[in-house]
Swiss-Prot record:
One of its GO terms (cellular component) is membrane. The lineage of its organism: Eukaryota, Fungi, Dikarya, Ascomycota, Pezizomycotina. It is found in: Membrane. It is a multi-pass membrane protein. SUPFAM superfamilies: MFS general substrate transporter. It comes from Aspergillus oryzae (strain ATCC 42149 / RIB 40) (Yellow koji mold). Residues 1-24 are annotated as: Disordered. Residues 11-22 have a biased composition (Low complexity). It comes from the Eukaryota. Keywords: Membrane, Transmembrane, Transmembrane helix. This is MFS-type transporter oryF.
Amino acid sequence: MAEEVNERTRLLSQSDDPSPSLEELEEWEEPRNWKVSYRWLCIAVISVYGLISPVIAAIIVPAMPQIATDLNVTDPGMLQAFVSVYVLGWSFAPLVVGPLSEVYGRISLLNTGHGLFLVFNALCAFARSDYELLILRFITGAVGSAPLSIGAGIIGDLWAPEERGLSISLYTLGPLLGPAIAPITGAYIVSHTSWRAIFAWCSLYILITWVVGLCTLRETFRPVLIQRKQAAAVRKGQLPGSVQHHHKSLADVFRQDLRRPFTFLGTQPIIQVLSLFMGYLFGLNHLSITTFESVWTDIYNQTPSRAALNYISIAGGFILGSQITGSLNDRIYIYYTSKDPAKGTPELRTILMLPAALLVPTGLLIYGWSAQTHSHWIMPNIGIGIYALGLIMSYQCIQAYVLDCYAVYAASAMGALTILRSLLGFVLPILAPLIYRTLGYGWGSSLLALWALVMGGLVPILLWRYGAVLRKRSGILEEM
């Protein structure tokens, strides 16, 4: 009996009909039915994976003077590029890794990427010229981006929609918290050793987490688990030898899977809107991180090591916002669905984006104008903390919305978001010196706050009003 191969599972050839028990997972095999403690262990490991890549993006900021001296770098733009080109690397790998994880599985690609991440980050410590370091930083960013695209898919594999809030809060905390704590760590290392030691210590961290991941993580993607179950049954003779799980040719992978993020970005208005908004937030975060130290060294005349301690305010805002959003997101979802399960739509994730739309610009205004007027040092810290709280609220709501909409293809959807997210994360920090030099911290932050208010207000309103209609008209979502 011929059956059409399901695009999401790609399990069998079209001419075979295996035992029904092998077409599905047993209850105990379902990732969402695994022990809660183990599922949280998986989330913790991928969150730790996701933390180190953003840390390495910003940890060299306090080491810029040493790098400039050691590698004879005289162009400030080149120093800024050491950070920006790393972020640019994030925009490429997820376009490949995300779709491939939906063909070959999440964990194998995640661990392979982390191993390559270890190798190229270690090589950065041996760079002898600015261009060597620039190229190695780009490659390191690319291979280190796997957790940023695959992690959301793993959360969707392990948790039901009403349970995802806290896991998303933990997972998204790392990529945003990393750049905030990185300068503190980098300043400490540089003050005691050299900039090359930064890469050595980070490589040690990557090695330890990689070993932990290899020992603890197992595949979570349901279609791949079914494929492996059927392949094992064939090897054991429990299925006829003619029954083989479907293997895609390399041409099929390129034609169907690797183009999926571009298809999402080109045909899905939801992805287009959210990628612009998320890209702006991501770029804004890296702009703030890379210029934050100069506020304290240039305006408040603090030493680099003392200036780095002010990043605690950013970290505090991220941690507080993460915990608030994770808990409230689940409570809001459960509240609406307990009355009517049909109300359990992705649009519930946009509710918390509205208060976040006020927090981000408010924090930026307090931060920028207090720095401009040389107010007490606590005021810029309060402002940047409020901004960080609102930013992570928006960030987590976007992740949750996309995950609810594109559960099966979550990794590809995140890959589509990554394109503009990383490009703006690359461009905005480069423009930061021009913005603040031309407008000052007050008006420069006001300009950034205005865009944050407009986008932060419009996006949740548009999705709440038209999100269901757009999802209904989406041909991709109809196939899922």
